């Protein structure tokens, strides 16, 4: 007897609807050429870490709540005297999401977090890197429902990079538009 494994809503939508739409739009010769999501990288830089060594761990705890996965503390690669930064000091946190957690995070990002951003007018459609990856920044991490606004002592910004298997920006833009990314017109 086979177990029915949990499948995220967006993954199901990708398999049933988005793959067909991408095939019709770009008419790929092979089914494996259809672009798909590869990974999502969330990076949180903590500029105040030089003054207080506890800040990166607090930011990492918030990032763990948002991503549902334990982040890696990033450390300074070299010393910069002007910033009072020493090599090896913790300066942020990052997490790489793949599979089920990636689709769940994407669902929360597009449907819950982005509409809660103050003065949000859409994502910049030029934020692609030329190889099918999309990068965006969020100024306040409290837009995510996992973060309790009353218990937050400081706002953190974060970078979110959505990596796809698309070979160019047009294919990646079409793929993310099918996932309901709110691109600016």
From Swiss-Prot:
Record bears the keyword Cell division: no
Pfam family, one: Ribosomal_L5
Protein family according to the UniProt entry: Belongs to the universal ribosomal protein uL5 family.
PANTHER family referenced in this protein's UniProt entry, alphabetically: 60S RIBOSOMAL PROTEIN L11-RELATED (PTHR11994)
Functional description taken from the UniProt entry: This is one of the proteins that bind and probably mediate the attachment of the 5S RNA into the large ribosomal subunit, where it forms part of the central protuberance. In the 70S ribosome it contacts protein S13 of the 30S subunit (bridge B1b), connecting the 2 subunits; this bridge is implicated in subunit movement. Contacts the P site tRNA; the 5S rRNA and some of its associated proteins might help stabilize positioning of ribosome-bound tRNAs.
NCBIfam families, alphabetized: PRK00010.1 (NF000585)
Record protein name field: Large ribosomal subunit protein uL5
Biological classification of the source: Bacteria, Pseudomonadati, Pseudomonadota, Alphaproteobacteria, Hyphomicrobiales
């Amino acid at each position: 007897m086979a177990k029915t494994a949990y499948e995220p809503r967006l993954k199901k939508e990708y398999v049933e609807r988005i793959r067909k739409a991408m095939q019709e739009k770009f008419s790929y010769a092979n089914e494996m050429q259809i672009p798909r999501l590869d990974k999502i990288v969330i990076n949180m830089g903590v500029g105040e870490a030089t003054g207080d060594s506890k800040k990166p761990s607090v930011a990492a705890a918030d990032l763990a709540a948002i991503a549902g996965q334990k982040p890696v503390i990033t450390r300074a690669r070299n010393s910069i005297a002007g910033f009072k930064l020493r090599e090896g000091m913790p300066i942020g946190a990052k997490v790489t999401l793949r599979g089920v957690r990636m689709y769940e995070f994407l669902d929360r990002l597009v449907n819950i977090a982005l509409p809660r951003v103050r003065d949000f007018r859409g994502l910049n459609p030029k934020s692609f890197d030329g190889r099918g990856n999309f990068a965006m920044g969020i100024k306040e991490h409290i837009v995510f429902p996992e973060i309790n606004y009353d218990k937050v002592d400081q706002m953190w910004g974060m970078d979110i990079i959505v990596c796809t298997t698309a070979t160019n920006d047009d294919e990646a833009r079409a793929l993310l538009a099918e996932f309901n990314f709110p691109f600016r017109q």
